[in-house]
C-alpha cells in the first residue's frame, strides 16, 4: 500500500511520477491509488505489468491512460464507469496534445514528442482524480 491514504490529488500525482522511475506507466498510476483500491502493491504491479509501452509495442493505448481507466472502473459506482472513462480519456487527450497512442505521444515517426512518459503518468493520475 502507498502512504497516501486520504492524501490530496497532488500528492498522488507526485508519488506516481516518482514511482515511474521504477516501473511502467500503468503500474505507476495504479500504485498511486493502492490505498483507495484496497490492493497490495504487488497485486497492482502484476495487474499493470502487460500494459507498459503501449501494451508492449508502443502501438497501443498509453499504459498510463489504461491504468487511470482501471482505477476508475474499480472505484466508480455502478453505472458510472463508462462516463468516468470518457471523462478521463477526454481530459488526458486535452493535457497530452490530443493523443492517446503511445507511439504518437512519444513522437515515433514524427520526431515531435507530445508528452513524456512522466507527464503521461502525471496527467493520467490527474484525470482519474478529477473524474472520481
What is each model feature region?
Residues 63-64, 68, 76, 80, ...:
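Catalytic phosphate/nucleotide-handling subdomain of diverse soluble enzymes
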Residues 3-5, 86-132:
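C-terminal binding/interaction regions
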Residues 1-20:
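Polybasic, low-complexity association/targeting segments
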Residues 51-71:
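Glycine/serine-rich anion-binding loops at beta->alpha junctions
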Residues 37-47, 73-87:
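Phosphate-handling active-site elements
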Residues 16, 29, 33, 47-52, ...:
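Short alpha-helical scaffolding segments that buttress acidic/His motifs in well-ordered protein cores
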Residues 2-5, 30-49, 95-102:
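Acidic-glycine-rich active-site phosphate/pyrophosphate-binding loop
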Residues 29-33, 65-75, 124-128:
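Buried hydrophobic packing segments
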Amino acid at each position: 500500500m502507498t502512504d497516501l491514504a486520504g492524501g490530496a490529488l497532488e500528492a498522488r500525482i507526485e508519488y506516481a511520477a516518482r514511482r515511474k522511475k521504477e516501473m511502467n506507466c500503468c503500474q505507476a498510476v495504479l500504485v498511486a491509488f493502492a490505498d483507495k483500491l484496497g490492493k497490495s502493491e504487488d497485486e497492482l504491479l502484476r495487474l499493470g505489468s502487460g500494459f507498459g509501452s503501449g501494451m508492449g509495442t508502443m502501438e497501443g493505448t498509453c499504459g498510463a491512460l489504461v491504468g487511470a481507466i482501471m482505477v476508475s472502473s474499480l472505484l466508480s459506482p455502478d453505472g458510472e464507469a463508462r462516463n468516468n472513462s470518457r471523462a478521463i480519456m477526454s481530459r488526458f487527450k486535452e493535457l497530452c496534445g490530443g493523443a492517446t497512442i503511445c507511439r504518437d505521444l512519444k513522437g515515433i515517426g514524427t520526431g515531435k514528442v507530445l508528452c513524456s512518459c512522466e507527464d503521461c503518468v502525471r496527467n493520467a493520475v490527474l484525470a482519474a482524480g478529477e473524474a472520481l
